[in-house]
Amino acid sequence: MAFNDLLKQVGGVGRFQLIQVTMVVAPLLLMASHNTLQNFTAAIPPHHCRPPANANLSKDGGLEAWLPLDKQGQPESCLRFTSPQWGPPFYNGTEANGTRVTEPCIDGWVYDNSTFPSTIVTEWNLVCSHRAFRQLAQSLYMVGVLLGAMVFGYLADRLGRRKVLILNYLQTAVSGTCAAYAPNYTVYCVFRLLSGMSLASIAINCMTLNVEWMPIHTRAYVGTLIGYVYSLGQFLLAGIAYAVPHWRHLQLVVSVPFFIAFIYSWFFIESARWYSSSGRLDLTLRALQRVARINGKQEEGAKLSIEVLRTSLQKELTLSKGQASAMELLRCPTLRHLFLCLSMLWFATSFAYYGLVMDLQGFGVSMYLIQVIFGAVDLPAKFVCFLVINSMGRRPAQMASLLLAGICILVNGIIPKSHTIIRTSLAVLGKGCLASSFNCIFLYTGELYPTVIRQTGLGMGSTMARVGSIVSPLVSMTAEFYPSMPLFIFGAVPVVASAVTALLPETLGQPLPDTVQDLKSRSRGKQNQQQQEQQKQMMPLQASTQEKNGL
């Protein structure tokens, strides 16, 4: 009897699974909001230099007298004239037509607050010579996500999924709330980094805790559900940001609910699979019997005992001798192969995804509308991905989503910018494919790595995704040399990654591996199967040769 048989004995997919999956997945609605929050909290409204304090606009000829025009005929955002360009002579003897000498906005800026009444940009003047600080805030958030994936992924394998999730909910709630009350830019960035750390871990542990409590045939459903919840979170952000335009209030609205998640997370049941992998049979038995009671299978749960578990889970008990370390990903050839291939998939997906998302302003429409469109395309894309995952397997779904995304982006690079509708449609289609790739890779990675190092593997994969999101803005700078160069790079990487997917094994209908030995056995099994097929193909040829020799 394997662990999957024990799950069936205590109810399979019952009341417990429905309750816990719902409670674990619910906070992901707001996780999506945090990931793209700065699209609204750090929005840049139209702005221009503030005229000198002693300026008299009625005498100088109006505001236009102080504002030079850019190449598009719009007022400059970061420069003003040193003196008005028409009107009576100025105090320094300037003629009516002015000197046309410009200077930076030494008296500050005037912002158009009609759409965004308050953002971190307007509050701390993150424009012009300070505009890099706006991107720095988002980069630091991504650094936090990177650190969280590594640190908490490791801790979850050591301490358990439940304990780390409880800590993450509290950290997200506290750091997000503190960011809303940040007195200055530096404090804001510190708390955003802490939020990024905890949110990365929530995403990873949410998938793992749910998958480890589900039978084999339902794991794809859970992965797809999590993907849909994330997409719905993008819709939610558009609505919340529209209703709560002040950045501090918006930051609070998406952070405070994590206090609720922190409270009810104490009722989560730790993964019995993790307990058994840690050699804690007493806790494994307690967890399974508790699940059996919730699922109405109390009699079946009563049949379980320490001896039954010891007999049934001999393989899992071998893990109690010691957990695998992160270095095992590089030491063991089997794990190293998985690590390198999956790292490429994670990097390519995130790299291309953020390459598209960071160009949202190029659509020239309302940011709220863009948020809705990019959330809407995920729904049909992930549904198609779900069908492929369940019918054809994880590997074809992963390969197709990356390949189609890369093709859409590459084609976009050769279409003239005047064809706005075509370019926008391709970008939306490419984004949908990349969203499907994210949906698939979370499930695929969790099924490929053994229990002993599953969280560490997911954490390292998420780390590579964050590296991709950090590198992506740097690639966008190549547009200065050739406008379509970023699109060619963003498209080529997922195409190459789709080919790498062919080097990974299929996991459809396979039990979750618990040890590295399971991976080796799976690999040897496939090699033996291939050899048997080759022998079957050779037998008719050998028989034909013997007949000819007999003649």
UniProtKB/Swiss-Prot annotation:
Extracellular side: 31-135, 188-195, 246-248, 359-368, 417-425, 506-551
The keyword Lipoprotein is assigned to this record: no
Tissue and organ distribution: Highly expressed in kidney; in the particular segment of the proximal tubule. In kidney, found preferentially in the cortex and outer medulla and weakly in the inner medulla. Expressed to a lower extent in brain.
Sequence segments annotated as region (Disordered): 514-551
Domain observations: Multiple cysteine residues are necessary for proper targeting to the plasma membrane.
Entries under NCBIfam families matching the protein: 2A0119
Gene: Slc22a6
Note: Involved in the renal transport of a variety of drugs with well-known nephrotoxic potential, therefore may play a role in the etiology of the drug-associated nephrotoxicity. Uptakes the diagnostic agent PAH/para-aminohippurate and clinically used drugs. Mediates the bidirectional transport of PAH/para-aminohippurate.
Molecular function via GO: alpha-ketoglutarate transmembrane transporter activity; antiporter activity; chloride ion binding; identical protein binding; organic anion transmembrane transporter activity; prostaglandin transmembrane transporter activity; sodium-independent organic anion transmembrane transporter activity; solute:inorganic anion antiporter activity
Keywords assigned: Cell membrane, Glycoprotein, Membrane, Transmembrane, Transmembrane helix
The protein's name: Solute carrier family 22 member 6
Organism: Rattus norvegicus
Protein family according to the UniProt entry: Belongs to the major facilitator (TC 2.A.1) superfamily. Organic cation transporter (TC 2.A.1.19) family.
Compositionally skewed regions (Low complexity) per UniProt: 526-537
Glycosylated residues (UniProt): 39, 56, 92, 113
Skewed-composition ranges (Polar residues): 542-551
